[in-house]
């Protein structure tokens, strides 16, 4: 047997090394940048998952929360300052019903990542401060006139929300509160009429 030349031996070694390197590369492929990006995108949890909500829903919840705070604080004022039993009872009902609705709305908003107002804005605070300066029949009449106007507006907004909004939870909230708002309006109209009758008899 002839001894292979040094050149032939070097060639064989080179082929073997190349083949071995190719095998290792096949077993451990280097991830390309697109692959790495796709993996991270697939594995990263979406912050919006389960919390995404439209601007219309966000606007409705924010305004409903502010309106609810107005009703509760106005009701507390009426329960304390009203002269007529009908007005005092109406104020107490506002505290009870809108207080519960406010808590329900907070839970819905929290689950969707929406921050609701926790206190009155300057405009509504000013309205209640002016109302608080009244007393007796003047307070009763002014408060009930505001309540009739507010509940008519609330009903229109909640009807629109129940019809047009896309989010099922917010839509259901609006729809479920309509019967109570309509009852409040009937009560407000009756109490407002009573305050006018009393004023007419003075």
Predicted feature locations:
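His/Met- and acidic-residue-enriched segments that coordinate or traffic transition-metal cofactors
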Residues: 2-12, 22-202
């Amino acid at each position: 047997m002839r001894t292979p030349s040094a050149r032939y031996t070097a060639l064989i070694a080179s082929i073997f090394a190349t083949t071995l390197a190719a095998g290792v590369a096949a077993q451990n492929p280097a991830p390309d940048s697109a692959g790495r990006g796709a993996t991270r995108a697939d594995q990263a949890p979406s912050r919006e998952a389960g919390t995404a909500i439209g601007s219309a829903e966000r606007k409705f919840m924010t305004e409903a929360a502010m309106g609810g705070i107005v009703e509760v604080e106005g009701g507390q004022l009426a329960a304390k300052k009203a002269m007529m039993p009908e007005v005092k009872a109406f104020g107490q009902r506002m505290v009870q019903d809108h207080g519960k609705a406010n808590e329900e709305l907070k839970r819905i908003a929290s689950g969707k990542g929406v921050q609701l107002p926790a206190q009155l804005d300057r405009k509504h605070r000013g309205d209640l401060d002016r109302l608080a300066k009244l007393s007796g029949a003047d307070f009763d009449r002014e408060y009930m006139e505001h309540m009739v106007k507010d509940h008519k507006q609330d009903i229109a907004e909640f009807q629109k929300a129940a019809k047009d909004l896309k989010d099922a939870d917010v839509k259901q909230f609006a729809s479920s509160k309509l019967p109570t708002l309509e009852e409040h309006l009937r009560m407000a109209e009756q109490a407002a009429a009573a305050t006018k009758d009393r004023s007419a008899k003075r």
